[in-house]
């Protein structure tokens, strides 16, 4: 199979072809996803909640991310693997580079970091040193204590303008992808249209170039609160491979996420 690259996603954006991505944390699921054509996988710090049982992503370490990235890479040898740099792993550009090198050696193609204009120098340093960067704006889970919970971001003119400014700044600094989480559809559309780089949404409506879901949400195996933007594809199909195929097909056709999964 031909490897999936950042250029592959850029081509999707240019041709207005939606694409689906998903999280994975181990070999078996990574292989299943790759076998079914989900070739863009995030090794997310969401593993702190879904795998380790914490109530936030904050306890996750770089070593945790590297360990799971190694396993996922074995399952998806030709996939485009994104890996989160966890909480306090990129407080300075130098620290970010050192930790990015660790997860890149583990098999990641790109690192994802949460935050806006304050990360410009970090993004520049990483990209100048051949580390591709995916930005993450909107609801950034590592900032849960600042936000006071998991809440929709970017409502109101001032907040939406600030997020658009952040997105443009990250792109100008060299970011090659952007994740937008839990923002109004109208803002997601503004940002997606303003950027040259592909935008991946989660809780941002069906107006972004791609979509991502935490795999546990996509299969209905998350305990406790179920996010508004989540859909249990396994409940409709009864078969995990069929669920993956349905998720991919609904994203590519624009059926998912629907209005019931979106914010305004």
Swiss-Prot record:
The top EC class, named as a word, is transferase
Transmembrane region(s): none
Q: Which co-factor is required?
A: Mg(2+)
Amino-acid positions noted as binding 3-methyl-2-oxobutanoate in the UniProt annotation, renumbered to this chain: 45-46, 84, 112
Q: Which GO terms describe its biological process?
A: pantothenate biosynthetic process
> Is Transport tagged as a keyword?
no
Catalytic activity of the protein: 3-methyl-2-oxobutanoate + (6R)-5,10-methylene-5,6,7,8-tetrahydrofolate + H2O = 2-dehydropantoate + (6S)-5,6,7,8-tetrahydrofolate
Catalytic site positions: 181 (proton acceptor)
Q: Which GO terms describe its cellular component?
A: cytoplasm
- Where does the protein end up? Cytoplasm
Q: Which UniProt keywords apply?
A: Cytoplasm, Magnesium, Metal-binding, Pantothenate biosynthesis, Transferase
Q: Which Pfam families match?
A: Pantoate_transf (PF02548)
Q: Which residues hold Mg(2+)?
A: 45, 84, 114
A GO molecular function annotation here is: 3-methyl-2-oxobutanoate hydroxymethyltransferase activity
Enzyme Commission code: 2.1.2.11
Relay the cofactor remark from the entry. Answer: Binds 1 Mg(2+) ion per subunit.
Q: Does the keyword Acetylation apply?
A: no
**Family affiliation:** Belongs to the PanB family.
**Biological role stated in the UniProt entry:** Catalyzes the reversible reaction in which hydroxymethyl group from 5,10-methylenetetrahydrofolate is transferred onto alpha-ketoisovalerate to form ketopantoate.
Subunit structure and binding partners = Homodecamer; pentamer of dimers.
Record's NCBIfam families? panB, PRK00311.1
Identification of the protein by name = 3-methyl-2-oxobutanoate hydroxymethyltransferase
